[in-house]
Amino acid sequence: RLTVQDTNMGMNQSLIFAEGCENICICGGGELDGQGTRTNFPGDETCHGTPGRPFLMRIIDCRDVHVHDITLRSAACWMENYLNCDRVLLERVTVRNQTNYNNDGIDIDGCRDVIIRNCDVESGDDACCFKGASERNTERVLIENCRLYSCCNALKVGTDTQGDFRDVLVRNCQIGGVEHDPSGLKHRCSDSGVSLEMVDGGTLENFLIENITIDRA
């Protein structure tokens, strides 16, 4: 299997970056704007081909991360990436990320004890995505009372799936496709409401989705 270093080369440029930290709080009110429409950011389709295109937020190997009551807008690439973290809490976060290819909303990668609650996400790519770029498992995740809308997949596992995924509960959420893509890049509302793409050797266990509404997918 690949390592985190193999799969994340050139992706550490971000407006907010933390590695090996504890007790992080990013809270509002207020707004963080990644200015992803700026012409100085490369515009090719894939992140791997454009290492100069930053995330808005990338948090690696951190503990006790709390993001709440804030709006995150217009990243050049992914909006929020949490990699190999423990005890992550996202509450009342609004994400509007539809300016470029690869405009994911929330990416959870090898994290444990995660709560995503009362968040509102509209993204050009995956709205909320579970990834496994290393062999560290993603475990004990709760997503509830969220609105997740996307031009691609509203709720997704993969495609980086070297690690395993277990004990995930998604409930009381509204998910689907955005009404239109303001970037004009994809010319569609959505690929799917829920997409489970285990392609790299990881396993999916005890992944429960209940009481959700899907439209425009």
Regions found by a protein language model. Give the residues of each.
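Extracellular/periplasmic carbohydrate-active domains that bind, remodel
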Residues: 1-217
